Amino acid sequence: RAFEEAGAVADVFIIRNLTAQAIDESVEKMVSMIKNSQIVMLPGGFSAGDEPDGSGKFIATMFRNPRIKEAVTEFLNERDGLMLGICNGFQALVKLGLLPYGEIRDLETESPTLTFNNIGRHVSQIVDTRIVSNKSPWLSEVEPGDIHAVAVSHGEGRFYAPESVIKELFKNGQVATQYVDPQGVPTMEMPYNPNGSLYAIEGITSPDGRVFGKMCHSERFVDGLYRNITGNKDQKIFVSGVNYFK
């Protein structure tokens, strides 16, 4: 819906995995769709039933299939494609190495991860996030410092990485968004930082900005929703992605 409202033609793909044949057919279909797409979006919302231990692992397993990996590599390196992952999709992009490295690769001990919320349970609320960098095509319609009220709903959203890695992400402009308090200041305090993400990081990008992952559900907002919540709620992510190809 969010992409269609932004002017895109969106195809929803459902992975079928009840049999080995169904998996093989799903892989073949996914490869075909990637080769005929300009944008690949990995959704959240308890994708795959949030199993096993967070559905990002299931999504990542599919994308590590050699045929799909090859299609994604060609999609990013030769066709200037864009990728977006929200919530579970963000988890998958991180587990694949697409974030923050921009390619599907084996992870190292210092690679960033998304782990369990500090409070040890699921959180569902509205939080404020601030645009830190708009080097990504996904954020071309906003400016650094802009603040948006966005929904969160997750159990494993805490961004964690060694401090040296995080500093490098900031230096490269790859930290896209942070959780902030009512004064617009990044914070580690609940409920403003709902999961305890280090440096209040909510979303990051690949080095070239074309792969973007975030925990907050920007796709949930429609006009007339959250009427009792103040603040700007439209991050213009989807229209930015679509406009990139115009």
What do these predicted ranges mean?
Residues I59, L114, W138, V142:
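Short clusters of hydrophobic/aromatic residues that line enzyme substrate/ligand-binding pockets
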Residues E4, I126, I131-K246:
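C-terminal and late-domain segments of enzyme folds
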Residues R1-I86, F90-Y101, T109, T115-S124, ...:
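N-terminal beta1-alpha1 cap of cysteine-dependent amidohydrolase-like domains
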